A protein has these predicted regions:
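Alpha-helix-loop-beta-strand connector modules within alpha/beta enzyme cores
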Residues: 67-93, 126-133, 185-199
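Conserved, mostly hydrophobic/aromatic
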Residues: 27, 44, 52, 104, ...
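Catalytic beta/alpha-barrel core
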Residues: 53, 69-72, 88-97, 109-122, ...
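Catalytic alpha/beta core domains of metabolic enzymes, predominantly
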Residues: 12, 17, 130-201
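Short, well-ordered coil/turn segments that N-cap beta-strands
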Residues: 20-22, 48-50, 85-91, 107-109, ...
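N-terminal amphipathic alpha-helix/helix-capping segment at the start of soluble metabolic enzymes
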Residues: 1-25
Length: 202
C-alpha cells in the first residue's frame, strides 16, 4: 500500500466494498434443506442484509454428519442459488476442494475461502483464476503478514476483487469448549495501514 489514503473499491451485484457502506452477510451455517434456505433468504431480505450466506459443502469441526447431508451437498448449492434469485439477494458460499471451483463459481456471487484454507495456495490460485470476488478469512493462528501474503496469491493471478475477513483468534490456553474465537480488533486497523483491500469481520 503506497498511498495510505488509497482503498480498493468494487461492487458485487451492486453492493459496494471499500466505501462507506458496511455490507452485511446473513444466513445459516449450512444449507440443510430447500425450504429452510428459502425461509431464511426471505428473512435476510426483509431485515435488510446485503448477502445471503450458507455452506453447501460445509466443513465441520467433527466428521459426524447425516447421510442426507452427503447426498444433498450439490443440491444445497443450487438451493441457495435459487433462493438468492427468488429474493434478489446475492450469495456467498465456502469452497473446500479445488475440484469444485468451476461448479461453485457458476452459482455464487462471492467465493469464500475459510480460515482452514487461508494458506491452501493451490486452492487460492484456482479460485483467483475465476475472477470471481473472493472473501479470504484469516486463520485464527495466522499473523497479519501471513494473511496479506495469502491475499497476494489471489491478486497475483489478476483477480483484484479480494475481501479480507477477520475471523478471530483462538485462545487455546483456556481450553473452554463454550468459547471458540475472540475477535482481534487490533488486526483490522493494522491491516488497513498495510493494505488497500476492503476488510470485514465475522
Amino acid at each position: 500500500k503506497k498511498d495510505k489514503k488509497h482503498v480498493s473499491n468494487f461492487s458485487v451485484s451492486g453492493i459496494k466494498f471499500g466505501g462507506e457502506l458496511i455490507p452485511i452477510f446473513a444466513g445459516p451455517n449450512m444449507v440443510e434443506s430447500e425450504q429452510l434456505i428459502y425461509d431464511i433468504a426471505k428473512l435476510v431480505k426483509q431485515k435488510g442484509a446485503h448477502f445471503l450466506r450458507g455452506g453447501a459443502f460445509k466443513p465441520l469441526s467433527f466428521p459426524y454428519r447425516s447421510a442426507k447431508y452427503n447426498e444433498t451437498r450439490h443440491l444445497g448449492l443450487k438451493w441457495i442459488y435459487e433462493a438468492g434469485k427468488e429474493f434478489n439477494i446475492p450469495i456467498i458460499t465456502e469452497i473446500m476442494d479445488q475440484r469444485l471451483v468451476e461448479e461453485i463459481a457458476e452459482y455464487t456471487d462471492i467465493i469464500q475461502i475459510g480460515s482452514r484454507n487461508m494458506q491452501n495456495y493451490p486452492l487460492l490460485t484456482e479460485c483467483a483464476k475465476t475472477l470471481k470476488p473472493i472473501m479470504l478469512k484469516r486463520h485464527y493462528g495466522a499473523s497479519l503478514r501471513d494473511w496479506l501474503g495469502a491475499a497476494e496469491y489471489i491478486l497475483f493471478e489478476g483477480n483484484k476483487k479480494v475481501i479480507l475477513c477477520e475471523r478471530g483468534m483462538s485462545v487455546p490456553h483456556t481450553h473452554r469448549e463454550t468459547s471458540r474465537f475472540s475477535l482481534d480488533l487490533q488486526v483490522i486497523p493494522a491491516a488497513k495501514e498495510l493494505t488497500h483491500l476492503p476488510i470485514v469481520s465475522d
